[in-house]
Amino acid sequence: MLSVIICTYNRRKYIYNCLKSIAENDFDASKYEILVVNNNSTDDTEGECRRFGSDYPQINFSVCCETSQGLSYARNRGIEEAKGDILVYVDDDATVNREYLSTIAQFFDRYPDAMAAGGAIYPVYETEEPKWMSKYTRELITAYKDEGRRVIRMTGSRFPSGGNAAYRREIFDRVGRFDPALGRRGNLLISGEEKAVFYSMKRLDMPIYYLPSMILYHIIPQSKLTKQYFDNLTLSIGRSERLRTLSVSKAVFGKRLVAEGIKWIATIILGIGLTLRLSPEKAAKIFAFRRNVTRGLLGH
């Protein structure tokens, strides 16, 4: 059985369409459940969930409330409440394709070695994509992911986005739960909780795959395209990496600092290239990205 877990905080505008896209999948309703974990929403997210439950009575649908604020707390509550052996996390500001659930179910049946999987993520802008957006900042802002048209094992530093990921339940008994010190908390943009889980899995050589037909369409509002959001997000990425690596060891943190130096070299090369191609606004953004990540990594 699949358990589709949607952790939500103040997503009244998007949650109904998210749930609707799952319910309208070409998949037997008796083979999955949808579980919403409401993380102290103050808008009418709960009302939209009730509306969905009324409109789709055939769906095994439930809502629980996690009062400890934070995405990691909500995700961990989902593990506790879910009944399935495959746990699927879907972002609350997104929709999925009609083959989403069947793709996941068939994959885990065909790949008994697989312990987790993630899919493609395509942005859906509510306004135009800004001129400063490049392939280097698109993944950062929108969680864009496209690893090609084939099922592949994600090796090295590659891993799925936490908002479009499926896990065998048993992995959480082996690597532990999502770290509450990481992950979004209300409007705070700390992240990295799923990255910590995936790296723990890789240390145990637990296979993680990419599924091209597991598609999520991520809605990007204008509020995520502002300078304030960009600076807050990128600074939070650095802070998250500091927390994540120091929680493992000082040696791992030291390696991350060395990696940051290498990333600066790549950033300078990319920035020069973009400037020469007459895209100075794109170059400025990748420099701002690297600067903010470094500041967060150093504890600012």
Task: Give each language-model segment a name.
Residues 232-240, 246-300:
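Non-catalytic, C-terminal membrane-associated alpha-helical segments of glycosyltransferases
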Residues 21, 38-47, 94:
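A conserved acidic beta->alpha catalytic loop
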Residues 162-167, 171-176, 181-214:
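A short, conserved alpha-helix in the catalytic core of glycosyltransferases
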Residues 136-158:
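Short, flexible, basic/aromatic active-site loop/helix in glycosyltransferases
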Residues 66-82, 103:
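Glycine-rich, basic loop-to-helix element that forms the pyrophosphate-binding segment
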